[in-house]
Amino acid sequence: MKNNDKLDSHTPMMQQYLRLKAQHPEILLFYRMGDFYELFYSDAKRASQLLDISLTKRGASAGEPIPMAGVPYHSIENYLTKLVQLGESAAICEQIGDPATSKGPVERKVVRIVTPGTISDEALLQERQDNLLAAIWQDAKGFGYATLDISSGRFRVAEPADLETMAAELQRTNPAELLYPENFEPMSLIEHRHGLRRRPLWEFELDTAKQQLNLQFGTRDLIGFGVEQAHLALRAAGCLLQYVKDTQRTSLPHIRGLTMERQQDGIIMDAATRRNLELTQNLSGGSENTLAAILDCSVTPMGSRMLKRWLHMPIRDIRVLTDRQQAIGGLQDIAAELQTPLRQVGDLERILARLALRTARPRDLARMRHAFQQLPEIHRLLQPIDVPHVQNLLSQVSQFDELQDLLERAIVETPPVLVRDGGVIASGYNAELDEWRALADGATDYLDRLEIREREKLGLDTLKVGFNGVHGYYIQVSRGQSHLVPIHYVRRQTLKNAERYIIPELKEYEDKVLTSKGKALAIEKGLYEEIFDLLLPHLPELQLSANALAELDVLANLAERAETLNYSCPTLSDKPGIKIMGGRHPVVEQVLKEPFISNPLTLSPQRRMLIITGPNMGGKSTYMRQTALIVLLAHMGSYVPADQATIGPIDRIFTRVGAADDLASGRSTFMVEMTETANILHNATEQSLVLMDEIGRGTSTYDGLSLAWACAENLASRIKAMTLFATHYFELTTLPEKMEGVANVHLDALEHGETIAFMHSVQEGAASKSYGLAVAALAGVPRDVIKRARQKLKELESLSNNAAASTIDGSQMTLLNEEIPPAVEALEALDPDSLSPRQALEWIYRLKNMV
């Protein structure tokens, strides 16, 4: 039986529940029942599994037992956090009617909907990570993509041209929740993601989207945002905005504009590159030993989030990058001092979002007040800094003296968590509130006086006055003296050793006190809403200030990191090439216990490709990755881990580094490797930086060497990209002799007996040998296996040396040794002196057949 079949056969309470559930069929409905939120039917079963709570039954309705699960109302946020992390959504249904006046079930309604992408509550968010809601649209023209961070109001759109670019955007933004149309075709792109929401096609209708967006921004058209013709992106943005309005059920004044993100504005990195460079997530899925882990010592959560956005979106605008470099240089002397007041500013960005949604809690307002109190000190520290970008940011940080004064007068020093707890509004702010509070607070004095008076008047030494949450105020007398109480004492409660009474005077006072407490709380709630009304008109300036403070935090952090980690300011040139003196890997140098060996690198139009050889563990991958990371850091405006660096124009960074089977998609290591290689060969340009590590190792020697040769040749001669090409195929070291713009470098090692010492130093020229067996021994491969391998190596080297010299050129090359025909192998194995005449004749026929 479906839950809503034959509604009339259910109890009135279950009828109410089923009507509400019908409005939210796809998400869990938490239905308030006294001190619990309860879930019924299929919701109860799902919640029991997801939240690990007991599944029970609650009586019967329509003749069937009702599956039920529940959580205490005061623990709801903990359970919502777990649901959100699992990509689930929930509707919170509260009692809004008065039980005393209700006929039948108390009136209830859904007051908020919690989804992974629309949360703004501090308890549900990770403070140092963006939490994005996204929507995707796809048709024959390409993709439309929109993201919104409801906790900041940051609204972005893009139009990725193809599947690879869309995959890179999804990895970069990593949305907590993704809306997609019901006819979406490339499901392989999104099917493994959490928080997927299938939406009807009409929600992506273009005209409706434009209308919704103009209504939100208070504009007649979208030309001012530069998105009027971005039809694919606008479809996604319209669906996203409607979804937010449906779930938040309030106005969204902090969402005030839309920004178009264009590929050409930044350095493009595909999904594989972001993963391989371990910017914010390591290859194991954690955050340890990533670039962000080393670079992010920001003192505010909003600064930390901005830094990670910069890491994932390196830009090409030299003017902006120069501004950032100059700001970092200007802040180095005061970075530590500036971080002290910035730390006290806290997460102003998200507090303002909760203010806009009218969900800010008392402690949010106290934190806002504390942030305002830091602004004069920030101004004092920054005013002497003669750097245009610093002064521009400072001009965006207003000093909100009036708002600070309002919050200092209105909010107590240490407010409670919730307004409903009372005691949020400070004494002296509102005379009427003070009067009602005085009445409620005077209860203690009155009760003390009443107790003394009654005890002396009646001569009952066990008499005392108290309060109980269930029965209210009472006069308690021991059982032994209860027969002495006067007739106007009305029994209210009997205990084992005492009786409790009420008298008209106490009852009258009880009504007065309870009324005063209720009245005081009602006035407080009204005043709290009024404070919102006084703050909200200043929201645009507040958001501008919060954004500027976040950027100042990022720049001060980068200044501190540059000083502490010995980074230098790179030169950004308009001439092609990369020249690095004393370059270091920013993460590896911090993790290593021994000193990191720095290395130079030169790429130019005359030296476009480096063929990198050397032993495993010698540092080839580190050398390649550090180059990409130095380029990336330079294009986010940061100083870099090098003695000196000059970086020319870069449009893309590609990495083909390492690989593993993609079991989820049914792709082998080699297939993953070739897919990434194809992407590079199709999309790289002269201004791209390409890292190719051990290409072709996932197949046979001949196939692998052929592919590696052809790829290197293509990158060097046709594409002319700046390429670092690490390989174990020593045949490739002859490429510089045959092609212009190609050079050999190697990482050296010293072998002593069966031990090996890696020098980690990059030298010009090709490596002399591979040291593979020494590395195997170092890894713990048994000695007898190493010994047998050395024997086999000598045999193979002997065969190779005795064979005809290989001739390798671009059109035809002999790879290692030609394959030996079976007839030749048979002849080599034959001992003619041991054959009889008959056997010799048989061998002639056999060899004839082989040939």
From Swiss-Prot:
GO-annotated biological processes: mismatch repair
InterPro entries: DNA_mismatch_repair_MutS, DNA_mismatch_repair_MutS-lik_N, DNA_mismatch_repair_MutS/MSH, DNA_mismatch_repair_MutS_C, DNA_mismatch_repair_MutS_clamp, DNA_mismatch_repair_MutS_core, DNA_mismatch_repair_MutS_N, DNA_mismatch_repair_MutS_sf
Molecular function GO terms recorded: ATP binding; ATP-dependent DNA damage sensor activity; damaged DNA binding; mismatched DNA binding
Binding-site positions, ATP: G614, P615, N616, M617, G618, G619, K620, S621
Any one GO CC term of the record: cytosol
Top-rank lineage group of the source organism: Bacteria
Keyword annotations: ATP-binding, DNA damage, DNA repair, DNA-binding, Nucleotide-binding
Segments crossing the lipid bilayer: none
Family: Belongs to the DNA mismatch repair MutS family.
PANTHER family to which the protein is assigned, alphabetical: DNA MISMATCH REPAIR PROTEIN MSH1, MITOCHONDRIAL, DNA MISMATCH REPAIR PROTEIN MUTS FAMILY MEMBER
Physiological role: This protein is involved in the repair of mismatches in DNA. It is possible that it carries out the mismatch recognition step. This protein has a weak ATPase activity.
Protein name: DNA mismatch repair protein MutS
